[in-house]
């Protein structure tokens, strides 16, 4: 876990699913964490971007779970929608996490990152298209 309180990893053990981080991603993370101005700006802006993204998703046939981090957990309207949605978005250059195999979730859950405003607008636009056309 990145940014966890000391000892948190030992206490959580196997209670949460892990995500492996490859060396290129780890190098990018080290570079991003070394830029203090970027970190401060991001911490200030992400909550605003997250709220805007969540409000933009209202009216779509999905449940938006409350979040205090840089992603939103979404429950889709059926167990058969998640995989189709992940492929649909992927073909449009939008990567989301399908939660089919995460304990306590299932194939009707996806996790979307809170991006920059233009990235969030693209995500919302494509989600609207997906649900409008049932692709």
What residues fall within each predicted segment?
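PLP-dependent aminotransferase class I/II
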Residues: 1-58, 62-65
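Short beta-strand/turn micro-motifs at beta-sheet edges
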Residues: 18, 98-101
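Short hydrophobic/aromatic beta-strand micro-patches
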Residues: 3, 73-75, 113-115
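Residues that cap or initiate secondary-structure elements
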Residues: 8, 78-80, 102, 118
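Conserved PLP-binding catalytic core of the aspartate aminotransferase-like
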Residues: 47, 59-92
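Generic non-transmembrane alpha-helical segments
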Residues: 31, 52, 56-60, 84-94, ...
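PLP-dependent enzyme catalytic core of the Aspartate aminotransferase-like
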Residues: 91-94, 101-135
């Amino acid at each position: 876990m990145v940014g966890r309180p000391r000892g948190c990893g030992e206490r959580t053990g196997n209670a949460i699913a892990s995500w492996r981080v490859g060396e290129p991603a780890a190098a990018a993370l080290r570079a991003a964490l070394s830029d203090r101005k970027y970190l401060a700006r991001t911490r200030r802006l992400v909550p605003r971007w997250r709220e805007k993204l969540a409000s933009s998703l209202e009216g779509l046939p999905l449940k938006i779970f409350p979040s205090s981090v840089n992603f939103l957990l979404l429950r889709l309207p059926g167990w058969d929608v998640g995989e189709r949605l992940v492929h649909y978005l992927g073909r449009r250059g939008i990567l989301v996490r399908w939660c089919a195999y995460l304990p306590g979730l299932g194939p009707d859950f996806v996790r979307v990152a809170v991006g920059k405003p233009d990235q969030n607008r693209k995500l919302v636009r494509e989600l609207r298209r997906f649900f409008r056309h049932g692709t």
